[in-house]
Amino acid sequence: FEVSELALYTIDMEIRDLLRRQKIEIIPVLGSITDGGLLTRVMAQHKVQVVLHAAAYKHVPLVEKNPIVGMSNNVLGTHTLALAAATAGVERFILISSDKAVRPQNIMGASKRMAELVVQDLASRSAGKTVFTMVRFGNVMGSSGSVIPLFQDQIAKGGPVTLTHREVTRFFMTIPEAATLVLVAVSFACGWDGIVLDESPPIP
């Protein structure tokens, strides 16, 4: 399920290539998490058991410049998706959140914290039919929007390298660690709780 046609096409081709010898049906759906009717129909039609909610605007400067759209997608979209999951009887709903939701310092972080509260509220009223939980990611090395590709590009162009502060410290997780965190949440979540990776030592 993806709102970007190019992103959906790309990931569909990648997954089909990886699973070309497996008899697994892949159904790409083009749509927005703000479309509650479509979400409910798709989940019910395909008997979806697990929802991994990673559809968020996460680039801090862009969300700062587009706060209404950022809040609409990250907060209202989360509410629409979580409600559709509960309505369709999905077994598990995993919200992919951010460490920026802790004492948020920007609009993106605030939107992720509000998304957590929205899902927590639905969890308290779901009567156990749908298990809601969340995982908080830090900086994922190599992911879209990660600072590492940005730094590499800036260095390749001869600098300067932009830092938020001279004394800044960043914690990183690898893509396999991030994937494992999500799988742990799917496997062991039994109610509203949060799962956070004990990340590697900070990189000063």
Where are the predicted features?
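Short helix-capping segments at alpha-helix termini
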Residues: 18-23, 89, 125-128
